[in-house]
């Protein structure tokens, strides 16, 4: 049972050395982290994550065993042919890694005073730039045929944008097109995107503040879907942004303000 990130090249290599495709099961768990090693392992890594399997021509007993393992680890089985798999992961995994690394590369040599101005937008877009070079050199090289047309289109789109930077209408259309693309990403548990309220809360940068905030959430009986934390350089405060339903956001805002917390107005967006 194979769990590598690229399927076609591995299948070809296996056939080249004379191993029957009937006893080789190509799979790929779509779960991982930007850091590696046993110390980075998580017991819940595969839970509710897609696990791709190409069972074409594979022995039924081996397929059954693979399905049982995937189910045991809590993942969601997705049947997909190896060629389609490589094209799909080139778009949703490999191209994002390349673009994130390219963006982070632009920061090299930048003045520290500039970098001190960065917020969650920059950190979010370069997070996976911290990935392991030795792993990604193999992934990108192995799937280069699927990556090249995507990267070429990305470069072409960037060059087109470069020629339109003084055209406000074109820039607006460019940003709107990105909004449409982002909206295509499935929401929680693979379902439809939901509208969340993002509630910013200023907290003191001292021990126990985050735990105290979560205690207040429990008291208010609200469900926190996600959160982000920002630290301002040179400041003794941090900004916690909680993602909640509109109803829970209103409830928590009232509750926290009554308790003396510094709560800003919530903003809504679809996730």
Feature map (PLM): residue ranges:
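Generic structural signal for residues in well-ordered beta-strands
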Residues: 24, 77-78, 263
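Interdomain hinge/lid region at the active-site interface
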Residues: 111-179, 196-199
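Short, ordered loop/turn segments at secondary-structure junctions
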Residues: 29-30, 58, 82-83, 229-230, ...
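Internal alpha-helical scaffold of NAD(P)-dependent oxidoreductase catalytic cores
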Residues: 45-130
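Short, conserved loop/helix-junction motifs that constitute active-site signature segments
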Residues: 17-19, 44-47
């Amino acid at each position: 049972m194979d769990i590598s990130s690229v399927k076609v090249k591995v299948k070809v290599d296996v056939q080249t050395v004379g191993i029957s495709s009937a006893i080789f099961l190509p799979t790929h768990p779509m779960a991982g982290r930007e850091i590696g090693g046993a110390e980075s392992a998580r017991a819940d890594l595969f839970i509710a994550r897609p696990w791709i399997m190409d069972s074409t021509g594979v022995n039924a007993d081996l397929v059954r065993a693979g399905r049982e393992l995937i189910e045991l680890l809590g993942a969601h089985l997705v049947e997909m042919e190896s060629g389609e798999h490589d094209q799909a992961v080139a778009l949703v995994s490999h191209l994002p890694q390349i673009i994130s690394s390219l963006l982070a590369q632009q920061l090299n040599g930048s003045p520290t005073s500039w970098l001190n101005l960065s917020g969650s937008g920059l950190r979010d877009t370069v997070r996976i730039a911290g990935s392991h070079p030795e792993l990604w050199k193999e992934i990108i090289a192995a799937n280069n045929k699927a990556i090249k047309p995507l990267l070429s289109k990305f470069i072409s789109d960037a060059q087109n944008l470069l020629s339109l930077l003084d055209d406000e209408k074109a820039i607006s259309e460019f940003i709107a097109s990105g909004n449409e693309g982002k909206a295509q990403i499935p929401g929680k548990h693979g379902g439809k995107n939901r509208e969340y309220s993002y509630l910013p809360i200023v907290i003191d940068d001292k021990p126990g503040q985050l735990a105290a905030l979560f205690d207040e959430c429990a008291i208010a009986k609200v469900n926190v879907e996600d959160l982000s934390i920002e630290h301002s350089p040179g400041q003794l405060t941090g900004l916690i942004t909680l993602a909640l339903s509109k109803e829970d956001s209103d409830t928590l805002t009232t509750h926290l303000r009554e308790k003396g917390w510094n709560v800003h107005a919530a903003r809504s967006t679809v996730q």
